Amino acid sequence: MVGHSESSTDAVIEPTSEELLAEQVRVFNKMKGSTNFNRVAEDVYPVEVTKSKLVCEMVVQHQHLNSKGTLHGGQTATLTDVITARAVGVTVKDKGMASVELAVSYLLPVKVGDVLEITAHVLKVGRTMAFTDCEFRRKSDGKMSAKGKHTLAFLPNQPGISVENGTQF
């Protein structure tokens, strides 16, 4: 039939970017005061979300530093892990995930007080794995301070993230 369109009951309603952002803010807020290792992301704040990208910001504080007074490499690696997994979790909600590969290249030092913009991209989501990358940029000059890569496997019979309790990272 000419001019026929699907009924509104058949259409899939996609969440808006504002709804996706609100969900990620709730997830990251659950990390505040966490007693597990996710606590290293408690100062991260999501600022932009799409189905293939998550942008967060973090002000570097003393607890994020190494003995040389710059952002600790382990902090950067953990943020790569957590933020890229959350980027995948924007669309993959029903599966648990585990890291298969995580790599970070450290390009420039970041000091206390610097604001980092952390952008995670979902490159591909397959049946059993997801591939991501992550860029850390100093907001003051836009220079890239670190570049990460993270490959995740989907775990059979494991729950996805629960926004209510912030579990499953």
Curated annotation (Swiss-Prot):
Family membership: Belongs to the thioesterase paaI family.
Record-linked PANTHER family: ACYL-COENZYME A THIOESTERASE 13, THIOESTERASE SUPERFAMILY MEMBER-RELATED
Matching SUPFAM superfamilies: Thioesterase/thiol ester dehydrase-isomerase
Top EC class, one word: hydrolase
UniProtKB keywords: Hydrolase
EC numbers, comma separated: 3.1.2.-
GO MF annotation terms: fatty acyl-CoA hydrolase activity; identical protein binding
Hydrolase as UniProt keyword: yes
Source species, domain of life: Eukaryota
Presence of the UniProt keyword Hydrolase in the record: yes
The name this protein goes by in its record: Putative esterase F42H10.6
InterPro entries: ACOT13, HotDog_dom_sf, PAAI_dom, Thioestr_dom
